[in-house]
Amino acid sequence: MQLTSFTDYGLRALIYMASLPEGRMTSISEVTDVYGVSRNHMVKIINQLSRAGYVTAVRGKNGGIRLGKSASAIRIGDVVRELEPLSLVNCSSEFCHITPACRLKQALSKAVQSFLTELDNYTLADLVEENQPLYKLLLVE
């Protein structure tokens, strides 16, 4: 299973915000510059993360974006559930005539649940705290 670029960059944006000194705001432009992703794509990602409460956007001259929760309260599995379309196969009888007898969807569903359960063991804080090599790569001080 490969995560979509939407989820990938959503996680990266959260990692960047969690790496900043506490309380420091950033901008969508800053995040796009760090990762080299289109601004339009990042705006959509940040909007969804904001609707889910993972990011807070502050308007105005001194505005920007920052984490909406503490990094230790953001489970990676929850973020993936929010951003990632997790249906691995299209099992409607319109597309597949073996749907009534097929057990593949159930097997894939169990595999996805195991994947997400493992990701639930990690918070955003686990990925960024005391990670000096990450801070250097992100040019965060």
Curated annotation (Swiss-Prot):
Annotated [2Fe-2S] cluster binding sites: C91, C96, C102
Keyword Manganese: no
Listed GO CC annotations: cytosol
InterPro entries according to UniProt: TR_Rrf2-type_CS, Tscrpt_reg_Rrf2, Tscrpt_rep_HTH_NsrR, WH-like_DNA-bd_sf, WH_DNA-bd_sf
Entry keyword set: 2Fe-2S, DNA-binding, Iron, Iron-sulfur, Metal-binding, Repressor, Transcription, Transcription regulation
Biological process, per Gene Ontology: negative regulation of DNA-templated transcription
Molecular-function GO terms, alphabetical: 2 iron, 2 sulfur cluster binding; DNA-binding transcription factor activity; double-stranded DNA binding; iron ion binding
Protein name per the record: HTH-type transcriptional repressor NsrR
Species annotation: Escherichia coli O139:H28 (strain E24377A / ETEC)
